[in-house]
Amino acid sequence: MKRYFILLFIFNFSFSQTTLMINNENSTINYDAKHVLHAWEGINDNVSGVIIYDNEISKIAIAAKVVDFDSGNSGRDSHSLEVLEALKFPNIKFYSDDSETEGNAITFNGDIEFHGQKKSIKVLGTVDDNENLINVTGKFQIIPSEFSIKLPSFMLIEMEDYLNISFDIQFDK
């Protein structure tokens, strides 16, 4: 009987999953955008999220407030909040329960919700898993017009219709 309980405990433990919260002090999401006349970038260092982990990431959910992106130019940021209708659509969210890992490379097949629209995307990244933390980095691109965003213009020329997104997200064990 004692063996049965020990085996049952080991069996249950081997299938346990751990929920890890994001360390938002050490996590960022960056974007860069371009116009014919100039390029700019912004950073959000107030990111929320969680992963389900059992020797690899099986699920991930990340959220960031639109208002927390900072390009270093308050006028541009203010105009961005208007264009992105931040009062109506305050958050950007990503969720995946379908990931593929090969070595330290990871592919998340998931959904991004931006400007009230949800789209399926593939996000490529790397995972650095050590004793105290899991660090996930990567890049992807989104096309604002696919999210019903009217592109802002300067001197009658619209900005380019893509945003490069990069992320460096840390989860403490």
Question: Language-model segments: what does each one mean?
Answer:
Residues 17-173:
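Low-complexity, acidic/polar, glycine-enriched regions of mature
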